[in-house]
Amino acid sequence: MENLPKSNSHNNHISASKGFGSQSPKKAKLTNRQQSPNVAQLFAQAVNYHQQQQFDRALTTYRQILAIDPKYIDALTNLGSLLKRLGQVEEAIAIYRQGLALKPESAETWFNLGNALQEIGQLEAAESAFKQTLQLKPNLGVAHFKLAKVLQEQEKLIQAVDCYRQAIDLMPDSAQAYTNLGNVLKALGQLDAAVTSHRQALQLQPNSAQTYYNLGNALTAQEQYESAAAAYQQTLQLKPDWAEAQLNLAVALIALENFEEAEQVLKQAVVLKSDLTLAHFHLAKLLQKQGDTSTAEVHLRQCWQLQPDEPKIWEALLLALQTQGKYSEAIALLQNHLKRHPDRAIAHYYLGTLYNNLGRYLEAISHLQQALELDPNLAIAHNNLGYALIQNGQLSAGIDSCLRAIEIQPNLAMAYLNQGLALNNQGRVPEAIACFQETLRIDPDYHPGNSNLLYALNYSPDYSPATVADAHRQWGQQVTSLTQKVLPQKSLSKLDSQSKILRVGYISPDFRQHSVNYFFEPILRHHDPTQVETFCYANVPNPDAVTDRLRGLCHNWRDVYNMDDDQLADLVRFDDIDILVDLAGHTGSNRLLMFMRQPAPIQVTYLGYPNTTGLANINYRLTDTWADPPGLTDEYYTEELIRLPRCFLCYQPSPTAPAVMDLPAKSMGRITFGSFNNLPKITPEVIALWSKILQSVPNSRIILKIRWFDDEPTRDRYLSLFAECGIDSRRVKLIGLIPDPNHHLAFYGNIDIALDPFPYHGTTTTCEALWMGVPVITLAGQTHVSRVAVSLLSTVGLPELIASTPQEYVAKAVALASDLPTLGQVRANLRQKVAASPLCDAVSHTQAMEAIYRQLWQKSV
């Protein structure tokens, strides 16, 4: 409670004699019955002891008087006041009640009783006592003030306002009454009136730090941050060591984006008061904004030690730990929290989400399910459970979880995104596209939604190349308008353009066990250090053995998963990169938005994505003349196409790949076709054409292998699609995940002829099939995505396997299936043929890339 206001005639305790109350005891006076000389003498002595602060003697003497005359009202009054002063409040209350039993019309005693009751928190009883006081003395301003304060403490704010205003009417010079009124008005949201009241208090008490502080709080609530900051600064001039005022000043400065001064103020606040949790919290947030996450963590840990169960604190600490890649510590933090609060749904949600990020999907599923048992309406937990189920191969269950999330929170963009991912993995491309479009209706700038939509368009035969290209361009224009930070152009010199060792950066989320590395690792391994100094920017959350191997091949390795786009762009510029190469395009976890900052003078896209990025400031795209014949596809790219002299790909087969097996048709007595491609490539149109092949080759069968066939509804759908084309389910074998890479390759031993899907060709699957002795029939299209196999087959010397029409595609497959001797000969020689081809000539391929890099550099300077 604030200091009590003073009036001309009233102090904390009301007394009929001047000076009595909280300051001095009441002196003896005659009552309507004459006091005995002994009692009067004792009372005078007690008052003297009281005034001399000889409290023990005063207590003894007052009690001696009351033993003689229990109805001695002045002795009761003074004894009650003394007991209260000594902290014996309950005894004081009992004494006041004795006095009121003798003299119920005593406003003074009712007032003192109210004070005592308020002190021990008996607010309703205190309210009643102050109301009794005012019935007896309606114009007693201090009683109105005290009643208002008790009402305020009970959050009876509207009544408190009326009482403070009555107190002000009776005590117009009471600064504290104006201050308290201002605080109540602020709590009621009457901010203009609150500010006015605090300013009136300052007119009466211009050197009150507390009043400036309260004014600052009201101005902050009004979002008048400049005025609030000025008020807090006045507070600190009067009281420099007030840590809370420094905290509130910093909050105002942060709102004004004066981050540097706010940081200094917060540092002073935590020095003055090391247990001021909010100061540590805001300081941590500022440090995180500057990228100093490690120091931010120190302050967040201080917060956590002070308030370990405050959700905002452990959530912020959790984020800081994750940002630094301290996943084990983040897990330990959550596990520790759950030991104390096993029924806290949000903690299970965070732990499940963390396990999701680490790829530990079974553990993620367990904790997310526990979160939903505790809080069935936690939409984001349903969404993240859906993601975990999808990644665990349970596509249909994952879709159900996403739908439940949408039912609870219809505008949850991520739920539509994850539903779209699952539908895409099931091969339900039109439905997936619709989900991605709904994601973007909710959040048009959501980057994963945009990239997944653009990626999905490549699978669908329903969109023309021009339509797909326009969608990419429109996205590029959209993000260009949103990009706020573009780094200044690096100055280039012609003097050393020929001899300079080029600093080439590669950025990818796939520097791990991923098919991209069958094509990237041989380049990294064979770069000439006299020509190129390599930098790898690994946007990888969960490094593995492949990550470690690539790190060992690279001159400079950067882990950038926890960097935002600005931080990553600054790092690329700091590394003085000459040529920055994107290896992901619009595939998952790409960093295309970082390229908008133009961190390198030459920016290139290559390898990971079969179409344009749509970004005008990615200058070039590396390809070849088979995948992108000059004049055929150039108009679909925002980048300038740079064609390598041979295949744009260089394949590194697994050194532990099993040997090529005999032609299975010899032992099986029938031809087996197959495809190990992702399901969105295997559209109903593809199945219809494959079914014609099966119908044309009696007793033949087809094997499709992809991890998503572990989901029973997905298997059933594909069997139904074949059945609709007249193919009995006994002729279709669907295989799910084979986790061991060598066992996966060995499974090609069950296939005689591989069928390439269209319009989206296989890449890794085509190379694997060829390496394992399995010829691949492909249908050439008019875009890069439908010409990758054209490049691969031409490079290894098998152009006869390339069809230009669906009819020719069927005819080539049927003809090859009908010629077992030729098929057997192809199988026997195919691995050697591939190994001797330019497809596996890593040295020449890398030299060609380095020559292109040099040409691009010379052109730029």
Question: What is the role of each PLM region?
Answer:
Residues 1-670, 720, 724-729, 733-734, ...:
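Alpha-helical solenoid repeat scaffolds of the TPR/TPR-like class and their adjacent stem/linker regions
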Residues 507, 676-677, 705, 735:
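Short hydrophobic "strand-cap" motifs at the C-terminus of beta-strands
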Residues 523-526, 684-698:
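Short hydrophobic signal-anchor/transmembrane segments that target glycosyltransferases
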Residues 531-533, 691-724:
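A conserved nucleotide-sugar
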Residues 584, 756-760, 780:
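Short Ser/Thr-rich beta->loop micro-motif in glycosyltransferases that lines
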Residues 674-685:
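Substrate-binding clefts and catalytic carboxylate motifs of secreted carbohydrate-active enzymes
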Residues 678-679, 780-782:
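Short coil/turn segments
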Residues 755, 769:
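Donor-sugar nucleotide-binding helix/loop cap in glycosyltransferases
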